Structures are given as structure tokens and as C-alpha cells.
Design a protein with these regions (language model features):
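Long, leucine- and charge-enriched amphipathic alpha-helices
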Residues: 2-20
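Short interaction-hotspot residues at assembly and binding interfaces
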Residues: 15-72
């Protein structure tokens, strides 16, 4: 997986009303993904983690979700 800089991540998130979503799921899991558009019209690939992870692991999972969304945009224009 391509690793992006924090600056690239920030610029990506500031464009097109993007936001990171953490969705709590049954079975002690969370899906973390990037939504795009004012109404969340486009959803990026999800990173699934355990619900009981610490704040540092959660931050890293959010970075991975942003990186996956960045890769998806790079591939599809």
C-alpha cells in the first residue's frame, strides 16, 4: 500500500466535503472509511478493526482509510 504524507492527507480531506467515518458494528468491530460529498454520496474502502483498540491504533486505522481513499481516487481519476 502506498504511504502518503500528512500534508497530502490533509489536502485530500479538505477537498469535496470529505470526512472520516467510524461506524460501530456488531461483534466488537468498527469500520473506518472516508465519505465524500455534502451528503456522503461516495464511500471509500473500509478498514475494519476491533472496537477495543486504543487511541493510537484508531488514529493509524484512520490514516489507512484515508490512504485507501487516496489510492482509489488516484486509480479512477
Amino acid at each position: 500500500m502506498t504511504e502518503f504524507s500528512d500534508t497530502a492527507r490533509l489536502l485530500f480531506m479538505l477537498a469535496n466535503h470529505r470526512k472520516v467515518i467510524v461506524e460501530v458494528l456488531p461483534g466488537n468491530r468498527k469500520d473506518i472509511y472516508v465519505e465524500e460529498g455534502f451528503m456522503g454520496d461516495v464511500q471509500g474502502p473500509a478498514v475494519t478493526v476491533r472496537s477495543d483498540i486504543g487511541p493510537d491504533e484508531l488514529l493509524e486505522a484512520k490514516r489507512r482509510a484515508i490512504d485507501l481513499a487516496l489510492q482509489q481516487v488516484d486509480r479512477h481519476g
